[in-house]
Amino acid sequence: MNALNQAHCEACRADAPKVTDEELAELIREIPDWNIEVRDGHMELERVFLFKNFKHALAFTNAVGEIAEAEGHHPGLLTEWGKVTVTWWSHSIKGLHRNDFIMCARTDKVAEVAEGRK
């Protein structure tokens, strides 16, 4: 079991440090199914989850929303028929914080038990 999926987010302010290159290299190994994307000049973590239909995709979206609310850290979510794209980044620092990796791992944990996964 991944230690990240047991961790909790810390408050992240605009002056919080982004992950270093060394931290990035270490943390990304713990969430191997996630991709680093660069948008608007900052890094984001993104993964696409496939489902059998819209109902299952929407249920997963809502489950991710629940963990986001509980941690006070919110992703970008795009819900389509049979597909959910989840994107984590720290808006306040315009980049990646340890919180984003924690939430990727927690999203993976939700996906493990999600109904209707392809």
UniProtKB/Swiss-Prot annotation:
SS bond partners: none
Keywords: Lyase
Name of the top EC class for this enzyme: lyase
Organism domain of life: Bacteria
Gene3D superfamilies reported in the protein's UniProt record: Transcriptional coactivator/pterin dehydratase
Coiled coil: none
Gene Ontology terms: biological process: tetrahydrobiopterin biosynthetic process
Catalytic reactions of this protein: (4aS,6R)-4a-hydroxy-L-erythro-5,6,7,8-tetrahydrobiopterin = (6R)-L-erythro-6,7-dihydrobiopterin + H2O
Entries under HAMAP family matching the protein: Pterin_4_alpha
Protein's recorded name: Putative pterin-4-alpha-carbinolamine dehydratase
